[in-house]
Structure formats: C-alpha cells, structure tokens
Amino acid sequence: MIAKIGRITLRVFILVLLLLIIIDLVLGRVVNFRMDDSGLKSFFHDRKMEPHIGYYQSRGRQVRYLEVGDQQKATVLFIHGAPSSLSYWKGYLSDSSLLDRASLYAVDRPGYGYSGLGDPLPDIATQASILKLVLDSLHKAHHPIVVVGVSFGAPIASRLAMDYPDLVDGLVLVAPPLGPGLERIFWFTYLVENPLINWLVPPMLKSANREKVHHREELTKMLPLWSRIHVPVIYLQGMEDGLVSPSNAGFAKAHLVNASSLDIRMIPGKGHLIAFNEKDRIAGAIREMLDRCMKKRDGNL
C-alpha cells in the first residue's frame, strides 16, 4: 500500500514538473511575456515612435516603465495581469487613436518583466504605492488620469483610486477579479508553492502563482474600501471567461456604490483574453473614458 502511494506521488510530481516545463516553453518563449529595452525600442522605432524607457527604485524594488506620447496631454496608465509585462500593452501604446488624446504609460509590475522577474510582491496596496510614483514623482502627469487594469492588474488600478483619490480621474477594468474567491484556482496552485517543487517553477509562473495564492486574502482586505472610489468606471468582461468569474460584474455593481458612474459591458462569446481579441472595443472604452473625464474637468459634464 505504501509503495503504491509512493508511486502515485512520484507520478504526480513528474506530471507537475512536465506541465511546468511545457507551460514555460509555450508561454515564456512562444508568447512574448517580456521584451528587453532593445526589443521595445525596435518595436516603436519601426512605427516612427520614440519611447522613453526608465527604471526607478521604490521600497527596495527596481521597477521598469515605458512612456510614449505628448506629456502635455491627458494620461493613461496601463497595468498588466499575471503572468505578463508591460509589453502586453504594446499594441495599445502604439495606437494613434489613444496617442491623439493622451500620453501613455505602462509598467512592469514587481515580479514581472524587468522589475525583478520571479520575485513576486502579492501585497496590492504596496504595489499601488510603488506604481503611483510613475505619475506623481517621476513625471508630473497631466490630468485627467485614466488607469487601465487587466485581470490581476485591475485590483491594483482600483487600489490606486482608493488610496490616492486626487490622482485618478477614471478607471477602465478589463476581465477584473474584484471579489474574494471569484476566480479560478488550478489544482496545482497550492502544490506549486511546496519548496520541493517551487524551485523548479519558471520565474514568471512563480510570481503569478504566488499572487494567485494570496489574492483572496488581498481582495478581502479591500472589501471595506470600495466606497472610496468616486470616479467613473467602465467594466469589460467576456461572458465565457473561464479564469475570472463573470459574477465579478455583480460584485462591482454591489460595491462600487459611490462611483460617479459604472458602465458594465459583458461581451457575449468571449473569454478572458479580451484585451487581445477585443482590442478595438477596449481602446474605444479608454477613449470614451478620456473624453468623459476631460469634459468633466472642463465643466461640461
């Protein structure tokens, strides 16, 4: 009996290891979850654009960010999910319809890209405090400031609006896990945290998994704070999202009670990756939010 259990345990271990290797090969190499500075510059130079790529230190962390566009215009800050990096947003950062309206910023969140890959920081409030420096210290960002968060980036965008209400003028939340427990937990999520396995985990997945393990706890901390959000919010999600429960829309409606407006847009037949396969729709929502916030600041709304 003991020998049988041992064989089963060994098979599970080997299966998990093979799965991690396959995921790393597919996600880490086939899909560009991070681009180095040279690759990013080449991407934008090919489009006749000159990005600014910078690094800064905060709370003992080095953080990379990218800025493109006219800094005298309004501001959009993009916050990626997990696993990912600021290169996730390159199609948006080079979108002329957004650049006509705003200066565009994106960051590698702590633990991703070139902000300490594999060294995760699950604390959402701390992440928000680190990312806000892009807007109020490194650059004197022009208002209105719209923050766009996708997946795990959405709670961080929301926390920015909660903790720094004078900084954020509008939120666009894409496939957002907002309610504690309203997201998919994989069968291997907690197993991967075992030290016997964790050292084998690819760095980007180590960060994503650590955030996943602590996400419910972090979102629970935010439960009393949603009433702090007074800015307009656009919420977008695929109705067939298999990673983040569509019931998060109901959570948003129940908790964003003081948002000046809440526009929930559920997209039929679409899953979690709407930032990729519904880019025009998402970019359109960002333009709408910018226009709405600009009218409000001009006193026309």
Language model segments and positions:
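Active-site loop/oxyanion-hole signature of alpha/beta-hydrolase fold enzymes
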Residues: 106-145
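Catalytic histidine-centered segment of alpha/beta-hydrolase-like enzymes
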Residues: 270-279
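Conserved HGGG/HGGXW glycine-rich cap/lid loop of the alpha/beta-hydrolase fold
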Residues: 71-114
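Acidic catalytic loop of the alpha/beta-hydrolase fold
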Residues: 240-244, 272-273
